[in-house]
Amino acid sequence: MTSSVSFASFRFPWLLKTFVLMVGLATVAFMVRKVSLTTDFSTFKPKFPEPARVDPVLKLLPEEHLRKLFTYSDIWLFPKNQCDCNSGKLRMKYKFQDAYNQKDLPAVNARRQAEFEHFQRREGLPRPPPLLAPPNLPFGYPVHGVEVMPLHTILIPGLQYEGPDAPVYEVILKASLGTLNTLADVPDDEVQGRGQRQLTISTRHRKVLNFILQHVTYTSTEYYLHKVDTVSMEYESSVAKFPVTIKQQTVPKLYDPGPERKIRNLVTIATKTFLRPHKLKILLQSIRKYYPDITVIVADDSKEPLEINDDYVEYYTMPFGKGWFAGRNLAISQVTTKYVLWVDDDFLFSDKTKIEVLVDVLEKTELDVVGGSVQGNTYQFRLLYEQTKNGSCLHQRWGSFQALDGFPGCTLTSGVVNFFLAHTEQLRRVGFDPILQRVAHGEFFIDGLGRLLVGSCPGVIINHQVRTPPKDPKLAALEKTYDKYRANTNSVIQFKVALQYFKNHLYCST
């Protein structure tokens, strides 16, 4: 009995310890599992199905928006297939082809197109498309400004290789209108095609390659006045292209102003007169008051020639009624000074007619023509030009483009009043169309658009003679006849519109 109690007493603590140990292990296991589950759930991110990829929609701004962005003086100056003179705020002034009889128009258009194509060939039009550089080219090369005279040779600047190292470098250069060479003294196996249209460079040395490239020459082999060659430079799959302009430089034509640079050695005054001898005499008297020895050239297509007793007046007669622009051409052709001042025969010089001011403007700027004002009237107008296939649109707007730097009050424009100083040579290059016999002015500036840079300085003023009829019956009769010739009739307007349709390849104007 005693022994059984002792055994039971001994076994109970052991069982208790075992139970406690098992409970402890279970608790630890539960805690570890709980932490693990917590970690798993905290890092778990549900996977949602990805939406299908949709390509972005590429679109341009609507035309209404573009018109707001690129409009100048109500004119949408943006590339388009056909310019329009009757859209938006524009109102058509002339549709030039309407000046022709409809049955004559097909034949006129055929001749017009043939002449236009001839003009384009002579001007090198249309221009070649722009050269586009592919990305990541291993070359250095010129992008603009390489120019050579016909049959001359130049070094091509800026050629170099900037790509990765290679066991062998092979670069090929090609030209179309000239030949290529190099000044580098290297073996023939490193440079092949000297003096040919294709030059091949092959070398193991990067330094040698760049030395050869730095001394590559271009030789023009055919005579052109103005042509553009495209030279290509190839390495493996990379190709660079750049322009070489072949252009014959002009010989300067200079006028000696003399050691003292007197105004009479710089400027000649020119005018055209017709049936107004009394007006011309008043003009000459006013000129002599301020410029006693300046040369004045007069072209006259009146019936009766005048007697002018002035050592500094050159007087040229023409067939009766030969015309306004023909007389301008005659007068300009006889000028021997750097500048010519154009005035009408009924103008009047005053102390504000400072030719020296206009000379100073032309001497210090790139202007070809600078106008003054006639009693405050500058007649400034801007010409905006749009080219399209079937004819161009011409928009005339009053005013100027911008101020002329360095000359307060002066501006840049397209056309000015009949009182202007011009470079004699530039005036001759544009010329005055002699077919315009009676009423013409703006037509000269249209012909000169793109050739003449025109300015206006209103501070230089010439006066207009009074328009009261003369008391002398003979002079009054002359003025009456003059007015008939100067009338801007509907037939005269129609003639000029037809002329501009064909000659200037115009479609419409506003």
Swiss-Prot record:
Pfam families: Glycos_transf_2. InterPro entries: Glyco_trans_2-like, GM2_synthase, Nucleotide-diphossugar_trans. One of its GO terms (cellular component) is Golgi membrane. It catalyses: an N-acetyl-alpha-neuraminyl-(2->3)-beta-D-galactosyl derivative + UDP-N-acetyl-alpha-D-galactosamine = an N-acetyl-beta-D-galactosaminyl-(1->4)-[N-acetyl-alpha-neuraminyl-(2->3)]-beta-D-galactosyl derivative + UDP + H(+); a 3-O-{alpha-Neu5Ac-(2->3)-beta-D-Gal-(1->3)-[alpha-Neu5Ac-(2->6)]-alpha-D-GalNAc}-L-seryl-[protein] + UDP-N-acetyl-alpha-D-galactosamine = a 3-O-{[alpha-Neu5Ac-(2->3)]-beta-D-GalNAc-(1->4)-beta-D-Gal-(1->3)-[alpha-Neu5Ac-(2->6)]-alpha-D-GalNAc}-L-seryl-[protein] + UDP + H(+); a 3-O-{alpha-Neu5Ac-(2->3)-beta-D-Gal-(1->3)-[alpha-Neu5Ac-(2->6)]-alpha-D-GalNAc}-L-threonyl-[protein] + UDP-N-acetyl-alpha-D-galactosamine = a 3-O-{[alpha-Neu5Ac-(2->3)]-beta-D-GalNAc-(1->4)-beta-D-Gal-(1->3)-[alpha-Neu5Ac-(2->6)]-alpha-D-GalNAc}-L-threonyl-[protein] + UDP + H(+); a neolactoside IV(3)-alpha-NeuAc-nLc4Cer + UDP-N-acetyl-alpha-D-galactosamine = a neolactoside IV(4)-GalNAc,IV(3)-alpha-NeuAc-nLc4Cer + UDP + H(+). It comes from the Eukaryota. GO terms for biological process: lipid glycosylation; negative regulation of cell-cell adhesion; protein glycosylation; protein import; skeletal muscle fiber differentiation; skeletal muscle tissue regeneration; UDP-N-acetylgalactosamine metabolic process; UDP-N-acetylglucosamine metabolic process. The keyword Magnesium does not apply. It is found in: Golgi apparatus, trans-Golgi network membrane. Its EC number is 2.4.1.-. The keyword Transmembrane applies. Glycans are attached at residue 390. Keywords: Disulfide bond, Glycoprotein, Glycosyltransferase, Golgi apparatus, Membrane, Signal-anchor, Transferase, Transmembrane, Transmembrane helix. Residues 33-510 are lumenal. One of its GO terms (molecular function) is acetylgalactosaminyltransferase activity. The chain crosses the membrane at residues 16-32. Pathway: Protein modification; protein glycosylation; Glycolipid biosynthesis. It is a single-pass type II membrane protein. Beta-1,4 N-acetylgalactosaminyltransferase involved in the biosynthesis of T-lymphocyte CT glycan antigen carried by CD45 family of protein phosphatases. Catalyzes the transfer of N-acetylgalactosamine (GalNAc) group in a beta-1,4-linkage from UDP-GalNAc to the galactose residue of NeuAcalpha2->3Gal-R to form GalNAcbeta1->4(NeuAcalpha2->3)Gal-R glycan epitope. Belongs to the glycosyltransferase 2 family. This is Beta-1,4 N-acetylgalactosaminyltransferase 2. It comes from Mus musculus (Mouse).
